[in-house]
Structures are given as structure tokens and as C-alpha cells.
């Protein structure tokens, strides 16, 4: 008998706001414990347009993640206010946890992608980034794997890949707009997308 899959940190990009309900249905269908890290989406985009300091912008953007997190929680998803491995589909409301530790630079080079990677590091969990793109591209070609830690593609924030390599994490970037890809990624099966895994 196969052992249950370990908990997984899943960042749901803010661009997938319209996909929250079907994504939650897939998470529950697959049955793997998932800790959702919400993206900032439109909330963070608004902050970018304001003339505020880096520190103010940082915390305002994280507050935006929190708002998206509450939206996810409103669909019957338990909310977590501290870093903890989930036993079911759970959404992290990250503001308090991040204020307490303040682990990442206050810069637009660090957004919810790297924050999700930090959560995965703290919990010793793998990471799945669900976005509205197929994965990470280089010279217009979809990369099945990232092997260069200095790569700074448009699909993730500038600090993300280096952070993953520095901390030996395993991360996938997969489109959240294809149900079957999401299922396969949750089951650790081969899937269209990009693997970032410096351990192999």
C-alpha cells in the first residue's frame, strides 16, 4: 500500500482569482494536505502604483495577500495564522507570521513567489507555484527544468530561483488554468511545467 503524500505548499497566484473554486475542488478531490499561500494579485498591483516607501509597500502587498487569503477561506477553507504543516486543504493568512519574523527583504524583487518558497523552507515541504502561464520560459522556450540559479525570468519574482537554489528546495511552476496539470502536479506525476530542483 502506498504511503500518503506529504503535505505540499501551493502558491495560488493572484491572477487565478477566477479559478479559486475549481482549484479548491481539485485539491479536495486529490486529497493531499495542502497549505495554500495566496498571491497578491490585484491588491499588490494597486500598491505598486502608489508612491510609498519600500517597507510600506512590502507590508501593504502582504496585506493584499491576506485579503486574497480571506477570499479563499470564504469558500470553506480553514485559515492558518502561523506556519504549520496542514492535515487538509488550508490557507495561510501570512501577515502576522511574517510580521513576527520579517524574514525577507522589503523589495519588489521579493513577492509572494519567494514568500511561498520561504514558507516551504520553514516547513521542509515541496512547493508548487500555480500561475496563469505554462511554466518558466527562456528565449521563448518552455524550460522543463531550471539549472541556472542566476536565471531571472519574467514568470517568477527576481529573487525566487536563487532562493530555491540557496535553500535546496524542490519547486514546480505549473499552469493553474489546466485542471489535469494541477491534478498531476499534486500527485507528483510528470506534467507540463517547470521544475526547479537543485538537489538532483
Predicted segments, located by residue:
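C-terminal catalytic "cap/lid" subdomain
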Residues: 1-200
Amino acid at each position: 500500500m502506498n504511503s500518503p503524500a506529504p503535505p505540499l505548499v501551493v502558491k495560488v497566484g493572484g491572477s487565478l482569482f477566477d479559478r479559486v473554486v475549481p482549484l479548491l475542488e481539485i485539491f479536495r478531490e486529490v486529497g493531499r494536505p495542502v497549505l495554500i499561500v495566496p498571491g497578491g494579485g490585484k491588491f499588490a498591483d494597486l500598491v505598486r502604483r502608489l508612491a510609498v516607501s519600500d517597507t510600506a509597500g512590502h507590508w501593504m502587498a502582504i496585506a493584499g495577500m491576506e485579503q486574497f487569503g480571506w477570499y479563499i477561506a470564504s469558500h470553506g477553507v480553514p485559515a492558518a495564522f502561523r506556519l504549520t504543516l496542514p492535515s487538509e486543504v488550508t490557507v495561510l493568512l501570512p501577515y502576522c507570521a511574517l510580521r513576527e519574523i520579517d524574514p525577507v527583504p522589503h523589495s519588489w524583487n521579493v513577492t509572494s513567489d519567494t514568500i511561498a518558497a520561504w514558507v516551504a523552507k520553514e516547513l521542509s515541504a515541496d512547493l508548487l507555484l500555480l500561475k496563469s502561464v505554462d511554466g518558466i520560459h527562456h528565449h521563448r522556450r518552455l524550460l522543463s527544468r531550471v539549472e541556472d540559479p542566476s536565471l531571472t525570468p519574467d514568470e517568477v519574482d527576481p529573487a525566487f530561483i536563487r532562493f530555491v537554489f540557496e535553500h535546496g528546495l524542490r519547486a514546480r511552476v505549473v499552469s493553474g488554468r489546466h485542471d489535469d496539470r494541477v491534478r498531476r502536479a499534486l500527485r507528483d506525476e510528470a506534467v507540463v511545467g517547470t521544475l526547479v530542483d537543485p538537489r538532483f
